[in-house]
Design a protein with these regions (language model features):
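Residue cluster at the C-terminal edge of the helix-turn-helix DNA-binding motif
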Residues: 15, 24, 37-46
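N-terminal winged-helix
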Residues: 29-30, 34, 80-81, 87-102
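Short helix-boundary/capping micro-motifs
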Residues: 12-28
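Alpha-helical linker/hinge and terminal dimerization helices associated
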Residues: 42-43, 64-86
Length: 102
C-alpha cells in the first residue's frame, strides 16, 4: 500500500464511479481498477460492492476511508510546505577578496 493507492481510493470514494474517478485522476479505468484490486488484495477483501453499476463501500472500505483521509491530507500538506520552502530558498553567494584569491 502506498500514498498513491490511498489517493486513488479516496477519489473513487468521492466519485463512486470508476470512469469519473479515472478521468479525474488522468488514468485509464483499467489502471484505476488494477490499483484498487491490488489494495483489496493487500487488505484481504473488497473495499467496494458493485450492484447495478452502482458502487458502495464495504465496512472495510469505510474503515480505510476513515483512516486514509487524514493520512493523504497530511501528506499533501507536507508536499505543499516543502514546495513552498524550495520556492522561497535564496541562492547562496560566496565572495572572495582579491588578497585571499592569490
Amino acid at each position: 500500500m502506498d500514498i498513491r493507492q490511498l489517493h486513488y481510493f479516496l477519489v473513487l470514494c468521492d466519485e463512486m464511479n470508476y470512469s469519473r474517478a479515472a478521468q479525474r485522476l488522468f488514468l485509464s479505468r483499467q489502471a484505476l481498477r488494477q490499483s484498487i484490486s491490488a489494495l483489496e488484495a493487500e487488505l484481504c477483501g473488497p473495499l467496494f460492492l458493485s450492484a447495478h453499476h452502482k458502487l458502495t463501500l464495504t465496512d472495510r472500505g469505510m474503515s480505510l476511508q476513515r483512516h486514509a483521509a487524514p493520512v493523504v491530507e497530511q501528506f499533501q500538506q507536507m508536499q505543499a510546505a516543502l514546495h513552498a520552502e524550495i520556492q522561497s530558498a535564496q541562492p547562496v553567494r560566496i565572495g572572495i577578496s582579491v588578497s585571499l584569491a592569490v
